[in-house]
Amino acid sequence: MKISQIEKKKHLYLIKLDNGDNLTVTEDTIIRFMLSKHMVIDSQQWEDIKSFAQFSYGKSKALGFIAFQQRSQKQVQDYLLKHQISPDLIPSIIDSLKQGKWIDDQQYVDTYVRQNSLTGDKGPLLLKQKLMLKGIASQLIEPVLAQTDFSSIAQKAAEKIYQKYQHKLPSKALTDKIIQGLLNKGFSYDLAKGIVSQLSLEQDSQHIEDLLDQEFDKLLRKYSRRYDGYQLKQKLYQALYRKGYDSDDITTKLNDYF
């Protein structure tokens, strides 16, 4: 067999043989086999070229995927499968990428956790969950999390929640909101409690009264359509208490109204 034509197609090359066969290959394939027009090749060489061309194409796709963003091994594997790279070739592609330090799950974990410490707001439980979803083994994750101090991250996250709700909720509800927010972000309950205890959540009585008045008026409009008298009073009390208002303040408000 003889190569009758080599035609460049963007980042790839189309090789045509004089027997009608053709194959799209990467530049690495051209270089590795020193392919050129009029070159004579036998059937075994052609099979070797096809095999390496598939490997090289898959590796090229993977390198493009990780060029601008660090990826885990599983992310690269999934990407290659999605782009119809043969499952038989993927292990050798992954091995080549690992040898070249293009993918390194331990380094991925280190970078991910460090970046969260600098600019993120996630706790260890959520970080572990997200990393495991990327296919990273827990034994690579847990030692890094154990060595990381999450108190300052939790502090910043708590302050952000506080700033958002300080003018909307009474102290008890605000405390619950911050703790629940920290739990949702993957921090432990003990750390969340400790962080909240360090915050100054005291509110002046006038502010609490204003919040109670606003909430009372809103709930009154809601429940007065269906209830009246004692039943309405009970519904209002229960709803206001669930929202974190002090029992004595609620009772005073209800007595003033009824």
From Swiss-Prot:
Keywords: Cytoplasm. The keyword Magnesium does not apply. Gene3D superfamilies: Winged helix-like DNA-binding domain superfamily/Winged helix DNA-binding domain. GO terms for biological process: regulation of DNA repair. GO terms for cellular component: cytoplasm. InterPro entries: RecX_HTH_1st, RecX_HTH_2nd, RecX_HTH_3rd, Regulatory_RecX, WH-like_DNA-bd_sf. It is found in: Cytoplasm. Modulates RecA activity. Belongs to the RecX family. This is Regulatory protein RecX. The lineage of its organism: Bacteria, Bacillati, Bacillota, Bacilli, Lactobacillales.
